[in-house]
Amino acid sequence: MFSLSSTVQPQVTVPLSHLINAFHTPKNTSVSLSGVSVSQNQHRDVVPEHEAPSSECMFSDFLTKLNIVSIGKGKIFEGYRSMFMEPAKRMKKSLDTTDNWHIRPEPFSLSIPPSLNLRDLGLSELKIGQIDQLVENLLPGFCKGKNISSHWHTSHVSAQSFFENKYGNLDIFSTLRSSCLYRHHSRALQSICSDLQYWPVFIQSRGFKTLKSRTRRLQSTSERLAETQNIAPSFVKGFLLRDRGSDVESLDKLMKTKNIPEAHQDAFKTGFAEGFLKAQALTQKTNDSLRRTRLILFVLLLFGIYGLLKNPFLSVRFRTTTGLDSAVDPVQMKNVTFEHVKGVEEAKQELQEVVEFLKNPQKFTILGGKLPKGILLVGPPGTGKTLLARAVAGEADVPFYYASGSEFDEMFVGVGASRIRNLFREAKANAPCVIFIDELDSVGGKRIESPMHPYSRQTINQLLAEMDGFKPNEGVIIIGATNFPEALDNALIRPGRFDMQVTVPRPDVKGRTEILKWYLNKIKFDQSVDPEIIARGTVGFSGAELENLVNQAALKAAVDGKEMVTMKELEFSKDKILMGPERRSVEIDNKNKTITAYHESGHAIIAYYTKDAMPINKATIMPRGPTLGHVSLLPENDRWNETRAQLLAQMDVSMGGRVAEELIFGTDHITTGASSDFDNATKIAKRMVTKFGMSEKLGVMTYSDTGKLSPETQSAIEQEIRILLRDSYERAKHILKTHAKEHKNLAEALLTYETLDAKEIQIVLEGKKLEVR
């Protein structure tokens, strides 16, 4: 614009009334402008032409005289309304639409010089020279700046480009404000009117545009919406009618092209109209059909969503996975007591103390005792751990909360810890109560440093804090059940969290008898059924397996059309569980059947003539499960420990099948049927050497991880295992050579009857004949 040391502030508010008062006041009298007394002589302090005052001092004097109100109010040109009406009107119209902040109005152009009507202003006696002199004093001048002692008196305004900042602005202001043109070729009033059209472009805008008036913003928005609403109907109307004339013209043109007589033109138009109406009716019918189809699909969709939400399984899953605050509902176990638990008397006795505490806590607290916080049930699968927990809740008649360890953690981080908090919060609100966590090892496993699962420890940490943290949980008993107690974290199984650890073993003969009686009372069975005989033949069966045995017998009796369950059905179900289901549809040729008969009879001969081997239960060449034959061995009594002789006898029995094939068919015709037998024998020999300390060379030292041992030690272990297997093979070969006749008779009996029990095997080995079935 000007030199960078100049200060230009063209936005000046000069009310029109002040200008008129200044014109009417005599020369030697004072004028009041905005409440400030200013002498006219002071206004007429004109600087000689050869020494133009600086723009800075003149503008400062101008501000002092006129008492400027505010800069940028949108009224900069209002004081000169009478001098140039048309440009001022346009400027006022542009400025009235702006708000109270600085908005740059659009520049306008003055095509002709403004005309002065002094008569309307009452200034007919004033001369043009006086008016020019007065306006010249009122307007800021542009001249060379003075030397200023303080830099605070100078305002530096950045131009719109680096070129203007460095070299100055070469626009019309520089030309009009030069000394020669400004003083000799134009008057001040004419110059300012000519420059007025460029001033809005150079108005300095201060402030933040984000603080615009909300009222004006809403008003402008509503105006734009109104304009859009006014434009839209006319646009749509024009869009719809844009081709109507052409359609009419095309119809007339069509009639002319077809040379339709004028007498038939009306009929043509009528037919065209009828066809058009029919097409519209067809279109309307199609639209109605589509509308009905959409409505039907929408209703079906709503019913489908409603049905999914009402589905119990889906609703529960949705309920438990949508949020962290899943509801916890207690279950009353009034129909389950300790009478339903059979075969685990020691475990029942331990838990009855807890039930007594829940029923009568004062009996224990009066002596200073505290309720145990946690009870850990440990045992193999199917021994009744969950049933014991339900019996505790049923006997104590308290709320029972059930949760599985795998239900806590999901795909979201923090869900497991949140559900632990919700579970214990609900339990504390309903204390005294029982919380049963099944499969505790899935949530309470040992914590490890793993970068792959950094958040997996949150759930167990929350469980530890809830069980024995800063806040006590009086009246809440936690019962946990697991099949792998060695996998639990040490902080979880310490006293204070799980105070009691109850082992739930497999039932013994007495326990199996009680369990069989309990489940037999639920079905119809013959009086000849002896539960003790079945119990002796089901060594190692758990409570769940015994329940399955009775259920399979009932199903077999129903299939055979019997009214009661007999021993035959119970034996059938026992063999089905021990040896697998029969595969009678399999067709086996005589050669393979003969090999199988001699193979299975070899196992039976070794088991029968070895002193410490388990007694034979049944032998069969009927395909069962993955095998072509099977010999079932059952101990007469429960075995709590096994001797070295018993382990060697098991190895000898396993070797009997391959030895029989070698002796009968030769080494070139041995089969792969002995692979599982060798696996079993190798496992027994390896445990004898590495765990049981039954090797004379290696002694009683155990070797848990053979991969970390020295090559010499590994070689010694392998040598000892090889010796045990070789000796077992030789013993089995000696027995079969000694009892070759009995071996042959038993194989022929198996080929004839397919299945033989223990008594029938004994009859055959004694040289007697079996009764015809």
Swiss-Prot record:
Keywords tagged on the record: ATP-binding, Disease variant, Hydrolase, Membrane, Metal-binding, Metalloprotease, Mitochondrion, Mitochondrion inner membrane, Nucleotide-binding, Protease, Transmembrane, Transmembrane helix, Zinc
Similarity-based family: In the N-terminal section; belongs to the AAA ATPase family. In the C-terminal section; belongs to the peptidase M41 family.
Source superkingdom: Eukaryota
UniProt xrefs under InterPro entries: AAA+_ATPase (IPR003593), AAA_lid_3 (IPR041569), ATPase_AAA_core (IPR003959), ATPase_AAA_CS (IPR003960), FtsH (IPR005936), P-loop_NTPase (IPR027417), Peptidase_M41 (IPR000642), Peptidase_M41-like (IPR037219)
Protein name: ATP-dependent zinc metalloprotease YME1L1
Binding positions (Zn(2+)): 599, 603, 677
Disease: Optic atrophy 11: An autosomal recessive disease characterized by progressive visual loss in association with optic atrophy. Atrophy of the optic disk indicates a deficiency in the number of nerve fibers which arise in the retina and converge to form the optic disk, optic nerve, optic chiasm and optic tracts. OPA11 patients also manifest delayed psychomotor development, intellectual disability, ataxia, and leukoencephalopathy on brain imaging.
PANTHER family per the UniProt record, alphabetical: ATP-DEPENDENT ZINC METALLOPROTEASE YME1L1, METALLOPROTEASE M41 FTSH
Organism of this sequence: Homo sapiens
Binding site for ATP: 341, 383-387
Documented EC number(s): 3.4.24.-, 3.6.-.-
Gene name of the encoded protein: YME1L1
Membrane-side (Mitochondrial intermembrane) residue stretches: 317-773
Annotated transmembrane regions: 296-316
Stretches in topological domain Mitochondrial matrix: 1-295
A GO term for molecular function: ATP-dependent peptidase activity
GO cellular component: membrane; mitochondrial inner membrane; mitochondrion; nuclear body
Entry annotation: catalytic residues: 600
Pfam families recorded: AAA, AAA_lid_3, Peptidase_M41
